Structures are given as C-alpha cells and as structure tokens.
Amino acid sequence: MFQVLKFCWKVLCFIRDLVMNVVFLGFVLLLVAIISFSSGGKKSTALTSEGALLLNLDGYLADNRDETLRWQDALSELNGEHVPRKISTFDVVFAIQQAEDDPKIKGLVLDLNYFEGADLPALDFIGGAISHFKDAGKPVIAYADNYSQGQYYLASFADEIYLNSIGSVDIHGLSQENLYFKEMLDKLAVTPHIFRVGTYKSAVEPFLRNDMSAEAKANMQRWLGEMWNNYVLSVSENRNIKKDRILPNAKQYLAELKALKGNSTAYAQQRGLVTDVVTRLDLDKKLSALFGKGSDGKANLIEFDDYLTQLPDRLEHYNVPNKIAVVNVEGTIIDGESDEENAGGDTIARILRKAHDDNSVKAVILRVNSPGGSAFASEIIRQETENLQKIGKPVIVSMGAMAASGGYWISSTADYIIADSNTITGSIGIFTMFPTFENSIKKIGVHADGVSTTELANTSAFSPLAKPVQDIYQTEIEHGYDRFLEIVSKGRQLSKTQVDKLAQGQVWLGSDAFQNGLVDEIGSFNEAVNKAEQLVNQRQDTAVQDFSVEWFTDDNVSLISTLLSDTKKGAQEQLVKWLGLPAPIQKLQKELNILTKFNDPKGQYLYCLNCGKVK
C-alpha cells in the first residue's frame, strides 16, 4: 500500500512540475512576443540634423553582449525598478568608431550618472576610441552629478568635464579586501584538506588562515600599487595636470577640504579635476549651443542604444573569404556549458572547433577575461587552440582585465599574447580543496561508519581523509603544477626554472608580465587584430588586404534557455533582497558562492580568488 501511495505521490509531483513549467514557459513566450511587437512598432530615434552621440552607459561593462537586454528592460519597466544593464565594451567602441566617420555626428557626450564603472583595461579600450574620435576634430563632453573613481577615469579622456554644482569627485586610491574563514570553520568543526603548490597561491588562504600571509600581501601590494600609479599617470596625461594634483596624502586632503569648509565641489575645481560646475539646465544650454536643439527643445542628441540599432550588427556573419574569428572566454572557467557568468569548457571548445572547421577563418583571437577555474576545462580549451595551430591558423590572445591562473593556462601556448598594462595575469599554480565534516556531525550526535575493501575506497565527506588518499591528492597536484610549468615553458620559450621563479602563484600586472616574458606586447584588442593580419600574411605568398573580424558564438544557445537562466539568476538576487540581509552578510554569501562554481571532475583548480575585487 505504501509503495502505491509513494508512486501516486511521485506522479502528482511530476504533473504539478510539468504544469507549472508549461505555464511559466507560455508566460515567457507571451512576454517575449509582447516585447518584440512593442519594440518592432517603436521607431528608433534618429538624428534628423547634425547632433551628438549620447553615450549614456546605464550599467556595467563586460566583453560578452547580453542578448536579453530587451527582456531585462521590459521587466524593469514592469516592476518599476532600475536594474543596471550588462553592456558590451566592444559595442561601445564600435559605436564610437562608427560615429567618428558619421557626418551627422558632430560630437560625443558622456553621461556617466548611471555608469557603474569597469576595470581599467576596458576603460582604456574605450578611452582609446574616444581619443581617436577627438583626433577627428569632434569635441567630447563628460558630465555626472557625482563622479566615482571609475567614472572619472573614463571622463578624463574628454575635452571638458562638467560636475553638478553640488557634486563631488571621489578619488581615493585602490584597495582589496578578502574574507577569511578559518575561525568559522574551526567553530563548525570542519576539516579543510588543502593540497596546493605555490608560495603565493593565496586562492585557498581564506580557508586556512584568519589573515593574509606576508607573501600574498607583498605580492598584492606590488601589483596594486603599480595599477594605482597607472591610474594616476593616465588621468594626469589626459587632463594635462601634474600627478600630485590627482590625490594628495590624507593629511593634505583634509586640510584643503577644511579650508574650503567641506565643499567637495570647490575642492574638485581647485584641484583642476573638472572644467566647470553646472546645473543640469546649464549643461543642456551648453550642449544645445554646441550641437543644436532637437524637436523636444533640448540638445540634439542620439542615445547610444538607439544609435547602435541603426548600425550593422557587430555579431553578424558574412560570406567573405578571409575572416579573423574572435572567441570570448569570460568569467570563471567551468566544466561543461557556459552560462551568463561562466565560461564552459565544452562550449568554448565547440566554438573553437567551429573556427577550426571553417575554411574562411584564417586566424583566431582568443579574448580572455577570466580568473581561471577548472583545470580540466582549461586544458580542453587549450587543446582546441593547439588544434588550430596545427593546421596553420595562428592564435592570438587578447587579454582583458584578467587572464590569471586557468586564464593564463589557456593563453600560454598561443602564437602571440597581448595584454593591457593593467591586466591581472600570471597566478601560475594549482590546488585541490576537500572539506570533511566528521567532527561537525559528531557535535549534533551523528556518526558515520561502514566498511571498505581498500584504504582508498572511502572518500566520504563524513569520514577522515585517509593518509594514502591525502598523499595521492598532493602527488597529483604536484604533477599538475609541473605540467603548468611545462606548458608555459613551451609556449613562452623559457626554461622551467625561469617559469618557476615567475610562478608559485604570483600575480603579475600586464606591464610586469611583459618585462618577464609572460606576454609579448602591451596593447589593446586593436593590436591583436593587427597582429592576426600580420601573422596570416607572413604565412602566405600573396598578402591579404581585407580581413573581416567576426565574433564566433555558440549556436546551441537558445533565447529561451538564456531567458530561463536570467530569470533564475534574477529570482536568486530578488530572494536576497526580500530577506533583507545586511550588506556584510550579502558579501559573505557572494564569497562562499564562488565554491558552487567549482565542478572540476578531478577537483583540481587553476583559480585566482583575489584577482577581481579591486575597488
């Protein structure tokens, strides 16, 4: 009788889940149809006369484009919430480049009020496009009510910077802080079994210590200090002011602010950080005088999103004979398929194989923006880049904000590596982490017991890890580290001894990595394109004049699966909001959430935990 009831209950649960999923899917399809219909009927704003491009970046920058922006915008409109958007850095640069040659576009306006900032390499890339735009004789104006450090860095590329009359410029330097869990694990009686190689492999320190080791701190202080020097130097050159005008020491800063009776707006003016202070109305009058008025009586501007819809799609593929394929590897490298935040080894390998099989593809640019992740998935990706090289297709790596640990593993054997001066790279090291809870469950009166045929059979999380098993894990990790050294040695044409001195988990900034031979050139994505063309022509009797740069993406990803993934992510974020968790608890949850991304089949990771938190 019990079995019958159990079976009936399972059937009812299945029917319930099926009905709920069908209803939800129907709702999603209906909403997509409504969005498509409404956007199809809505005409894109276009300049009817000469005006300026308004670069109103409402959100944060990433390499990959969010294909569900209309969906996200519609949901934001429905629930009345402002949700920051994911904006592709490459779309921004593409729009600026097109505007430079557009006779109707007479200038560029940076509205940075809702821009959430980005890493310095992305800002440098956009800044380079802005500088080129200015060289064409077109003015660039930047405005924000208040400037964060990242917003101001981008604004510094403009001809003129305007600040609201009660605004401020928040430049404070760079810092990085990690959470450490050893005491918490001790209180919970969790035993973390850590197997690693590398003096500076700080990825696992949070589970072994309550503070940062002296070696990790020295390494971080070096590259963080260099990054800050690069920030100050760039702003100084862009604004044509002395470096010591950017940020004085704390004592001098306070003295100047007190002398101005705490007026941070006047302080920004006095330091030469802004051109002038204005009200919003004053700014519109100034822009109207420069670019004319539109039909609404305001300055004649076309918004970034509207302008982008009038341009050819950057992701469009064309039937041309000479292509340079671009493949993005963005986020933590995981085993399996990619999602919105992670780069799946199987997905990236499939895209690279597509470029391999396409005879029109002459070279591949691997765009890497990753702190690493699964050792297995990283090697699957690297093997596909080698397959491209074996058939004569050069592979050029363009590093973004970071290409560390697994991100460097997949880069190291490329034909040529280009990094930004502020790219975080290196972190050559490997680890395995295996926690056991035998003491935790004892505290609540639970015990684990059983039998095994050998000492190696029981790797339960509720039993102590046998010494032979621990020795096996450590031996495999040491082999993994040696393999890392071999790969880098082969790819960079350095001895293993030389690589080992640069390895041990040390993090390097792009400029130092260049000096040490870990990268070939300091430059942007544009230099990667130029190098790809050069390498192709070096291998051919007849030089190719025209190349088509095309982004290769995964054909297997459907809009519905992306929408469902985004909906799930949004629901998780909404749950955190509804719970009303304090900010420190939310930060703790995010830190620990990193562990959920770890899915390597052998539990081996090439990951730089400390590479993405500079603020």
UniProtKB/Swiss-Prot annotation:
Q: Which NCBIfam families match?
A: SppA_67K (TIGR00705), SppA_dom (TIGR00706)
**Positions of transmembrane segments:** 18-38
Cell location: Cell inner membrane
User: What is the official name of this protein in its record?
Assistant: Protease 4
Question: Periplasmic topology: which positions?
Answer: 39-615
- Species of origin reads Haemophilus influenzae (strain ATCC 51907 / DSM 11121 / KW20 / Rd)
Task: Give the matching InterPro entries.
Answer: ClpP/crotonase-like_dom_sf, Pept_S49_pIV, Pept_S49_SppA, Peptidase_S49, S49_SppA_67K_type_N, S49_SppA_C
Q: Which residues lie on this side of the membrane: Cytoplasmic?
A: 1-17
Assembly behavior: Homotetramer.
Q: Keyword annotations for this protein?
A: Cell inner membrane, Cell membrane, Hydrolase, Membrane, Protease, Serine protease, Transmembrane, Transmembrane helix
**Purpose of the protein:** Digests cleaved signal peptides in vitro, its in vivo function is unknown. This activity is necessary to maintain proper secretion of mature proteins across the membrane.
Q: Does the entry feature the keyword Secreted, yes or no?
A: no
Question: Which top EC class is given?
Answer: hydrolase
GO cellular component, alphabetical, reads: plasma membrane
Q: Which CDD domains does the record match to this protein? A: S49_SppA_67K_type, S49_Sppa_N_C
For this chain, the family text in UniProt reads: Belongs to the peptidase S49 family.
Coiled-coil annotated spans: none
- Tell me which positions the record assigns to the signal sequence: none
Its BP terms in the Gene Ontology are: signal peptide processing
